[in-house]
Design a protein with these regions (language model features):
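Short coil/turn segments at alpha/beta junctions that flank glycine-rich nucleotide-binding fingerprints
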Residues: 54-55, 109, 130, 171
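C-terminal peripheral helix-coil segments that are non-catalytic and often amphipathic
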Residues: 1-29, 122-126, 159-170, 189, ...
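Helix-turn-helix
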Residues: 43, 47, 51-85, 89
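Amphipathic alpha-helical packing segments from all-alpha helical-bundle domains
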Residues: 96-99, 118, 125, 129, ...
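Conserved hydrophobic residue
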Residues: 57-58, 174, 202
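Hydrophobic alpha-helical connector segments
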Residues: 89, 103-129, 182-186
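Generic hydrophobic, amphipathic alpha-helix propensity
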Residues: 40-49, 65, 90-98, 102, ...
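Amphipathic alpha-helical segments used for helix-helix packing
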Residues: 127-145, 195-199
């Protein structure tokens, strides 16, 4: 049995190659994280809104959103770590927009019923101008991925409306039922009003649809 002769250069060659690799990478910066380029977040949200309302939230992968937004998936995940975070951010941004539109119509000097009507009409006017956003809010009504932090933020945006509903109950304008009941009914009725106006199937004018829809809210 003979002992295989060790090439004296083999070990040294590996060491020299390793040393060269270290020299070549020394001081080299790691791959940069995706940059927060102005406008990328908005592009992602706008694209998500368009795709969610066309194909549905569950049927729209984040890869398609990033592709159609013209950004990398790394950039999308830089802003939104997962799809639920993206859905929640879009939902909250639209809810804030709604709150601003509705609150803009409010005037503390008006009687409670007039304030109520102005707020609802403000939402309907906003909804007629933003049908895709209304469709997305409808999709999210029972979406399980909306986090509690987003729900709390939305509640804070509309807490004044809960107070207005409470005043309407106290004054006998609406039936003496829980605020949550009336908030849900307002949402359902206004969604129905917007759907009927968009469909044009009733033969009624938008004002007639709105007037008859609002009449369903008041105490008989």
């Amino acid at each position: 049995m003979t002992t295989k002769r060790r090439d004296p250069d083999r070990g040294g060659g590996r060491k020299r190659n390793a040393a060269a690799a270290i020299r070549n990478t020394a001081g080299r910066q790691p791959a940069p994280a995706p940059k927060s380029t102005p406008g990328n977040r908005e592009k992602i949200l706008d694209t998500a809104l368009r795709l969610f309302t066309r194909y549905g939230v569950d049927a729209t992968p984040t890869s398609r959103i990033s592709r159609e937004a013209g950004v990398s998936t790394g950039t999308l995940f830089h802003y939104f770590p997962d799809k639920d975070t993206l859905v929640g951010a879009l939902y909250l941004s639209i809810k804030k927009e709604v709150a601003g539109a509705v609150r803009h119509q409010d005037a503390l000097s008006l009687p409670t019923k007039e304030r109520f009507v102005h707020g609802i009409r403000g939402y309907i006017a906003w909804g007629m101008a933003n049908p895709l956003k209304v469709r997305f809010l409808d999709q999210c009504y029972n979406y399980p991925g909306i986090g509690e932090d987003v729900q709390r933020a939305v509640y804070d945006e509309f807490s004044w409306m809960a107070g207005l509903i409470g005043a309407a109950i106290d004054e006998g304008i609406v039936p003496d039922l829980p605020v949550e009941f009336h908030a849900t009914m307002v949402y359902k009725i206004t969604s129905g009003i917007l759907a009927l106006i968009e469909s044009g199937s009733t033969g009624l004018s938008p004002d007639e649809i709105i007037g008859n829809g609002l009449a369903m809210l008041w105490k008989k």
